[in-house]
């Protein structure tokens, strides 16, 4: 948490294409690309077009990024490549896996806007924009006096509609010349230029602190643009787009119909020039179907000339030398090939297919005639289909046309155009026609004359519900034919093609236009962005950003889908999307939009500086009204202007409005027809003055106040937002600063209905505002005044003079005219709430309060922030140092906690329910939800890690914190009740919590999290500092796995290990709380949580020693490892180490492998630990010096460890045979009587250790049947008697090691001496070692050669090239089962294996057994395989009931570690290429463990999963040996 640089990480996943995901970043951020689990280990290269420092951006130029590995380790969990973002715009990245593109996306970096003489930064959230229709500003020398209104109103950005020469329609967006300044702005004696505009823009920026942006219009140009007639190829005309010919013919026919209707020619048929009702509309429909369509034969453009085609076909049939076509391709049917020139009956068919389809049975004329008739019939059918299709298009065309007529002439909300005339035709024309009138037939002849047809150009417009990524004028679209275009008859649609070479003039012209704009303005608004070809906009914006690197790009998108919006935002690098408050139907929806478009919830969690890059929604420019919107005074009421604009300006994003709104202009200011000028600023003007305005006009005075407030809130970090819908009309919006905990609360009473004609209640609900109201920032009411009523002025765009606002700023609460009474209510001891009773909060009123925490809470927050600065500089602002705090807080937390041992950290961080219950406690339970997994801090952190990134303040965990102090007290009291440093940590937390309890409840989750995450990360660092350098310098994955050691190794209230010899001087001791006497407190390893964590079921010999190397030796916890080895050595009996330890006194000696795992651990200890061989001479207190002695207390009989080792070896060669003590249901309620007979020994011929019988299960696969219903009770599922492969491997490892030590005289024995048939015999370690070596592969390997004479049971072999699971089992077929156990032997005794054979077996295991996390415990091809473990199921199925298949398929994790380590070892012997592939496999498998570890609330790896990695509810959630063997694999890497 310490560093303050903002870093975001983006995880790359295989085949993940994120083109529709918006990632927003700021300049100065670092972006790190990291490998997701699917890519770890693979050769991945990331490419981006983000330029190298000092280079200019080129969208097409990609370069690769270098990988950095902070730990220099082989695992990929921390590997990243990075970008330091210093440039605004849209940048693409993609990544290759080898040479194949595997995924990618875009990032958008926000521009930095600067303003003022000092060039200070204007944050995007501070923008307050106003739109001006430039043509209404008048002559250029009068602009300043009109723009001053925006300055005085507090706006800091002006959006000008296009400043270029306008087309004939005078629409602001139909430009006749993109490069020329509109001549209307010049005077007869003074011509103004772009240079003058640039100077004004610069003055506004420097002197007025106002930035200027303007539109760029790329889609169309005015129909009278001179250059489009010089370069007709720039438009969609009938030469370059012949597919539009049928639509053009229809368009002309409709124009002639319109002229005829205007002249009264259809009056008799029911259609006069003035269309007034539905009957006339139906008559139009009838006329079109009966008079128009039959005349123009549109279908002919899509049909074949039947006569011509048949004659051509006949000619081909009768050709002497026509090539005989064999059987036609059945997929190829005869179909019409569209004539690319779209001539009538100009379509064709493929004659080859025709000849292959219609074959005459001989060459006679009758056969040929018959064939031609069939061909004719098929062509007629195909033509009929086209006719039908055109009919379908014509049906849609009539419907669209009538919809248009209805809107323009009949609809209440339409323009009501009046009679049909040439100026206002029946429908807008879709194409230009720059020629004299002529007859339809003469007109049609023009479409085939290129020099004429090129001037018949398609108009632009928009299509309702169309896909914005599809160009509706391109071939394949029928929009013009179906009349689906809502057409702008003054503009021609521009045809760019795919690249500049496709239309060089147009691209160059528009690029120049863009460059003029970017030279003089700080930003652009992309007009009609959703129908601008995206590649064109990209090209133009790239040119603009070359001149204006921090270009502010705004756009309006009407795609109807956030995914589609994101494609435009990400590819174009749009800075802000325009959002309209006018889209809200009521105040409730308006409030929802405020919450949607910006800010985080009040009381949000503090996010770390390094965090995942999360998908964003586009930054909003939230406008109370845009220049396209209809007038809100008409739609709502004049009284709503003030409250709605206040609600909008309280949003935590950019905000904006349009000139005329503040003056209360009661009609829409039309971008097409408005020719009057805006008002000028004059402080002295009277309300009746129509040409001038000041603070007495409209809502200008209030607008200035809310604009200034909007800018302050954005600049000062009031980033948290809360919206409260007080009642149907009142919306309260809170903006809160998370650093100084001040709030600004606006209460707006909207007036969507006119208060003069609608009822509004006098009763306004009381409001409760938490904290202390410092001042009323603003109170304003919309009122009427006595002056002349509104009359539309002829020269100026004037507003309503009779409505204004009464405002008061920065007053005390008691001076307010809107608040009647403010009382103080306290909710609980630290909640300071003010109750507000309103009077005069009339519709159209707003009041804004500035609220601080009550002084007591403010101090408490300040002190908390002061103490939190030790964890993060984020808390510096708003912090407060005091002298009278608890003395413990004067000590940094790290120095208090640094004294904690790892065993104490186990108590502070972990302890599951059953461990905690031993101490009389338990895990914290959140009512109506669940209990925490751990009583320690990890239990809380697991939940906070889920809810913090999502800011899920509604989670039951947060509810519990807000509702009371129970959880807070639990955390500190649990620790204080213990002794020593743990209690000190508890006291530090308690002192912090004292202040936490004094702050408002809504802030408690955020600060509770901040305290805990600071403490938690410090504690983790303290843990790692006590571990080996492998951990300290390891990757995040290694570090998080190593915490499994802290999780599993601890000391309970009652020590689980037998006492060690008192003559050991470095044992840990503690004072017993009850007896007050000193007692040993050695840590023991739990086998797994939560099932094997406390009491006699905590410690198991086999689990302990499989886990010990990974959890204690690799992590550097040598003392704990030694103590556990010696404690178990003390319990040796019958030459065996117990499985269930039961503190030694309740031990069960029913396993054959624990002793060999114990010996392997002693060997590992000697090799890993400095001076590790010293352990061989350490005293072992024997609990059972003889097989039958009673348990002796520590120190009674001590002997060095090497003697105990020799005894274990001796007893095995001698042969072990005994019956378990207390045999029967009291120690095992399922075992059959014979199962309690234990045997083990060493085969004289082979040297293999063997043992067991078919009624017991002495290896790790130890499931005993327990179902009476399925009749498997007392039968082991996997007895594995005989010589189990991993035990043979482990014994070989032990024998080889002891041989080496004896040769160096470190181990005093060279042999074992045993009694056989009454005589003493010696077996040397050398001989024993050789026997295993000579026999292992011969007897365990299943040869790929079926005639191998070593094979005793060739009939049982069903997989070749593997190693048997056992040798000499009582059921011979069990030997031949494929299981993962042979990989253990490969790791501990690789010398037993021929590398090539080992590799083959490993490949089979990988293919058949390797799952996502674990290894299948049985070959899935085996008839008893079942991969789903359900211990609760009791049915008749012998193989499944009561979890009988525990080791018959489910995927266990710990063998995966051995499999991967074996692969790594043997891959090195198989050559560099194999080794590289294996490294990938290992990293890839481990990455899945990493993902599981990070996501697991237990922060561990499970015992097993069901097949294919599915969750198994019966598994331990975190298992010692699972974590250990994965950690060992990373150690081997």
Curated annotation (Swiss-Prot):
Q: Which GO terms describe its biological process?
A: glycogen biosynthetic process; glycogen catabolic process
- Note the InterPro entries from the entry: 6-hairpin_glycosidase_sf, AGL/Gdb1, AGL_central, AGL_euk_N, AGL_glucanoTrfase, GDE_C, Glycogen_debranch_met, Glycoside_hydrolase_SF
Modification comment: Ubiquitinated.
UniProt EC number: 2.4.1.25, 3.2.1.33
Q: Which UniProt keywords apply?
A: Cytoplasm, Glycogen biosynthesis, Glycosidase, Glycosyltransferase, Hydrolase, Multifunctional enzyme, Phosphoprotein, Transferase, Ubl conjugation
| Tissues in which the UniProt entry reports expression | Ubiquitous. Expressed in striated skeletal muscle, heart, liver, spleen, skin, spinal cord, lung, kidney and testicle.
Where along the chain is the active site annotated? 527, 530, 628
According to the UniProt record, list the residues that bear Phosphoserine.
Answer: 64
Q: Name one GO molecular function term.
A: amylo-alpha-1,6-glucosidase activity
Q: Which reaction does it catalyse?
A: Transfers a segment of a (1->4)-alpha-D-glucan to a new position in an acceptor, which may be glucose or a (1->4)-alpha-D-glucan; Hydrolysis of (1->6)-alpha-D-glucosidic branch linkages in glycogen phosphorylase limit dextrin
Identify the SUPFAM superfamilies for this entry: (Trans)glycosidases, Six-hairpin glycosidases
> Which cysteines are disulphide-bonded?
none
GO cellular component terms, A-Z: cytoplasm
**What interactions and quaternary structure are annotated?**
Monomer. Interacts with NHLRC1/malin.
Q: Which NCBIfam families match?
A: glyc_debranch (TIGR01531)
The entry's family comment says: Belongs to the glycogen debranching enzyme family.
Put simply, this protein is called Glycogen debranching enzyme
User: What taxonomic classification does the UniProt entry list for its organism?
Assistant: Eukaryota, Metazoa, Chordata, Craniata, Vertebrata
């Amino acid at each position: 948490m310490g560093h303050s640089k903002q870093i975001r990480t983006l995880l790359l996943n295989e085949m993940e294409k994120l083109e529709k995901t918006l990632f927003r970043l700021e300049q100065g951020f670092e972006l790190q690309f990291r490998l997701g689990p699917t890519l770890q280990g693979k050769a991945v290269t990331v490419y981006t077009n983000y330029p190298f420092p000092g280079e200019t951006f080129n969208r097409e130029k990609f370069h690769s990024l270098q990988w950095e590995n902070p730990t220099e380790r082989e695992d990929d969990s921390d590997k990243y490549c990075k970008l330091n973002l210093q440039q605004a715009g849209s940048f693409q990245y993609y990544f290759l896996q080898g040479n194949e593109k595997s995924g990618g996306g875009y990032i958008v970096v926000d521009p930095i806007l600067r303003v003022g003489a000092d060039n200070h930064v204007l944050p995007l959230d501070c923008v307050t924009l106003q739109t001006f229709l430039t043509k209404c500003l008048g002559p250029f020398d009068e602009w300043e006096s009109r723009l001053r209104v925006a300055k005085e109103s507090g706006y800091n950005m002006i959006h000008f509609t296009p400043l270029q020469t306008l087309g004939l329609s005078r629409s602001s967006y139909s430009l006749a010349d993109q490069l020329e300044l509109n001549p209307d702005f010049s005077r007869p004696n003074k011509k103004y230029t772009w240079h003058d505009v640039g100077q004004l823009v610069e003055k506004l920026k420097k002197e007025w602190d106002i930035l200027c942006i303007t539109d760029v219009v790329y889609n169309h140009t005015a129909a009278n643009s001179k250059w489009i007639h010089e370069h007709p190829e720039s438009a969609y005309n009938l030469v370059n787009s012949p597919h539009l010919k049928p639509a053009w013919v229809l368009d002309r026919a409709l124009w002639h119909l319109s002229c005829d209707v205007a002249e009264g020619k259809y009056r008799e048929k029911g259609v006069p020039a003035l269309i007034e009702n539905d009957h006339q509309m139906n008559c139009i429909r009838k006329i079109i179907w009966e008079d128009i369509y039959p005349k123009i034969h549109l279908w002919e453009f899509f049909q074949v000339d039947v006569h011509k085609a048949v004659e051509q076909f006949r000619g081909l049939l009768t050709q002497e030398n026509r090539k005989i076509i064999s059987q036609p391709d059945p997929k190829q049917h005869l179909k019409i090939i569209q004539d690319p020139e779209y001539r009538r009956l100009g379509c064709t068919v493929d004659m080859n297919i025709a000849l292959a389809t219609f074959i005459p049975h001989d060459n006679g004329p009758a056969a040929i005639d018959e064939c031609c008739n069939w061909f004719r019939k098929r062509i007629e059918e195909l033509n009929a289909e086209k006719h039908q299709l055109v009919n379908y298009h014509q049906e849609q065309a009539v419907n669209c046309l009538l919809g248009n007529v209805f809107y323009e002439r009949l609809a209440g909300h339409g323009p009501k155009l009046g009679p049909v005339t040439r100026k206002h035709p029946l429908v807008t024309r879709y194409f230009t026609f720059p020629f004299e009138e002529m007859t339809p037939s003469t007109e049609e002849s023009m479409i085939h004359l290129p020099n004429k047809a090129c001037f018949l150009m398609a108009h632009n417009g928009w299509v309702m519900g169309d896909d914005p990524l599809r160009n509706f004028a391109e071939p394949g679209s029928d929009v013009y034919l179906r009349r689906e275009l809502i057409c702008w008859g003054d503009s021609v649609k521009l045809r760019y093609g795919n690249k500049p070479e496709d239309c060089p003039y147009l691209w160059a012209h528009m690029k120049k236009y863009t460059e003029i704009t970017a030279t003089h303005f700080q930003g652009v608004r992309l007009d009609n962005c959703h129908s601008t070809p995206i590649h064109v906009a990209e090209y133009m914006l790239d040119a603009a950003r070359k001149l204006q690197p921090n270009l502010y790009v705004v756009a309006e998108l009407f795609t109807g889908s956030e995914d589609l919006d994101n494609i435009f935002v990400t590819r174009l690098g749009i800075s802000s999307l325009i959002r309209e408050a006018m889209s809200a139907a009521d105040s409730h929806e308006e409030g929802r939009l405020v919450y949607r478009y910006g800010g985080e919830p009040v009381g949000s969690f503090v996010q770390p500086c390094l965090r995942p890059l999360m998908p964003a929604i586009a930054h909003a420019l939230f406008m109370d009204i845009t220049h396209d919107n209809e007038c809100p005074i008409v739609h709502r009421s004049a009284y709503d202007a003030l409250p709605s604009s206040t609600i909008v300006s309280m949003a935590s994003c950019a905000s904006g409005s349009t000139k005329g709104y503040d003056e209360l202009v009661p009609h829409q200011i039309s971008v097409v027809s408005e020719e009057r000028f805006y008002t000028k600023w004059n402080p002295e003007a009277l309300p009746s003055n129509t040409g001038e305005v000041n603070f007495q006009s409209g809502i200008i005075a209030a607008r200035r106040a809310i604009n200034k407030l909007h800018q302050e809130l954005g600049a000062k970090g009031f980033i948290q937002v809360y919206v409260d819908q007080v009642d149907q009309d009142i919306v309260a919006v809170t903006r809160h600063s998370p650093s100084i905990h001040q709030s600004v609360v606006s209460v707006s009473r909207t007036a969507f209905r006119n208060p003069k004609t609608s009822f509004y209640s006098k009763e306004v609900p009381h409001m409760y505002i938490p904290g202390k109201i410092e001042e009323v920032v603003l109170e304003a009411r919309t009122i009427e005044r006595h002056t002349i009523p509104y009359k539309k002025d002829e020269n100026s765009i004037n507003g309503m003079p009779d409505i204004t606002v009464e405002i008061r700023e920065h007053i005390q609460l008691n001076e307010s005219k809107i608040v009647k009474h403010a009382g103080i209510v306290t909710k609980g001891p630290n909640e300071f709430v003010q109750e507000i009773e309103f009077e005069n909060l009339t519709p159209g009123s707003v009041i804004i309060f500035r609220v601080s925490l009550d002084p007591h809470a403010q101090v408490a927050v300040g002190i908390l922030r002061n103490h939190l600065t030790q964890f993060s500089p984020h808390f510096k602002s708003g912090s407060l140092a005091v002298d009278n705090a608890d003395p413990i807080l004067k000590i940094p937390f790290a120095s208090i906690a640094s004294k904690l041992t790892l065993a104490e950290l186990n108590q502070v961080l972990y302890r599951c329910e059953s461990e905690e219950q031993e101490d009389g406690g338990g895990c914290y339970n959140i009512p109506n939800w669940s209990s925490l997994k751990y009583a320690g801090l990890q239990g809380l952190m697991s939940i906070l890690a889920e809810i913090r990134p999502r800011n899920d303040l509604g989670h039951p965990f947060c509810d519990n914190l807000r509702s009371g102090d129970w959880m807070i007290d639990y955390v500190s009291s649990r620790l204080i009740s213990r002794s020593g440093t743990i209690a000190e940590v508890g006291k530090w937390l308690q002192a912090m919590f004292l202040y936490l309890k004094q702050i408002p409840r809504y802030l408690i989750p955020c600060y509770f999290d901040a305290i805990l995450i600071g403490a938690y990360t410090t504690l983790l660092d303290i843990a790692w500092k006590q571990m080996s350098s492998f951990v300290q310098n390891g990757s995040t994955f290694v570090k998080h796995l190593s915490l499994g050691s802290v999780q599993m190794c601890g000391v309970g209230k009652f020590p689980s290990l037998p006492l060690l010899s008192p003559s050991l001087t470095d044992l840990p001791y503690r004072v017993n709380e009850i007896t007050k006497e000193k007692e040993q407190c050695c840590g023991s390893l739990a086998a797994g949580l939560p099932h094997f964590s406390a009491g006699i079921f905590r410690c198991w010999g086999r689990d302990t020693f499989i886990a010990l190397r990974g959890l204690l030796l690799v992590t550097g916890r040598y003392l704990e490892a030694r103590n556990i080895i010696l404690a178990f050595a003390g319990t040796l009996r019958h030459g065996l180490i117990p499985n269930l330890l039961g503190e030694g006194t309740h031990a069960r000696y029913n396993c054959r492998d624990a002793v060999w795992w114990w010996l392997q651990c002693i060997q590992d200890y000697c090799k890993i630990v400095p001076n590790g061989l010293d352990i061989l001479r350490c005293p072992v207190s024997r609990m059972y010096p003889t097989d039958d002695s009673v348990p002796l207390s520590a120190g009674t009989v001590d002997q060095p460890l090497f003697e105990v080792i020799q005894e274990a070896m001796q007893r095995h060669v001698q042969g072990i045979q005994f019956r378990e003590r207390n045999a029967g249901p009291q120690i095992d309620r399922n075992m059959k009587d014979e199962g309690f007979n234990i045997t083990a020994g060493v085969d004289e011929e082979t040297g293999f250790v063997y043992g067991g019988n078919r009624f017991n299960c002495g290896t790790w696969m130890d499931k005993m049947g327990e179902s009476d219903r399925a009749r498997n009770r007392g039968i082991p599922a996997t007895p594995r008697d005989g010589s189990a492969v991993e035990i043979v491997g482990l014994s070989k490892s032990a024998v080889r090691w002891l041989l080496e030590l004896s040769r160096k005289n470190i181990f005093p024995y060279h042999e074992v001496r045993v009694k056989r048939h009454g005589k003493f015999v010696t077996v040397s370690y050398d001989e024993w070692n050789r026997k295993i070596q000579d026999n292992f592969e011969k007897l365990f390997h299943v040869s790929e050669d079926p005639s191998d004479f070593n094979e005793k049971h060739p009939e049982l072999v069903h997989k070749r090239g593997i190693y048997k699971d056992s040798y000499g089992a009582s059921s011979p077929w069990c030997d031949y089962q494929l299981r993962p156990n042979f990989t253990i032997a490969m790791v501990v005794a690789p010398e037993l294996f021929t590398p090539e054979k080992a590799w083959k077996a490993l490949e089979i295991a990988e293919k058949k057994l390797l799952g996502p996390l674990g290894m299948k415990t049985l070959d899935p091809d085996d008839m008893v395989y079942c991969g789903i473990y359900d211990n609760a199921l009791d049915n008749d199925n012998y193989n499944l009931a009561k979890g009988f298949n525990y080791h018959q398929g489910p995927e266990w994790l710990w063998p995966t570690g051995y499999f991967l380590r074996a692969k790594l070892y043997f891959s090195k012997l198989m050559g560099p290429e194999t080794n590289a592939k294996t490294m990938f496999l290992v990293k890839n498998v481990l990455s899945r463990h990493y993902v599981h570890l990070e996501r697991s609330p237990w922060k561990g790896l499970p015992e097993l999963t069901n097949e294919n990695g599915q969750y198994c509810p019966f598994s331990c959630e975190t298992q010692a040996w699972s974590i250990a063997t994965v950690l060992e694999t990373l150690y081997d890497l």
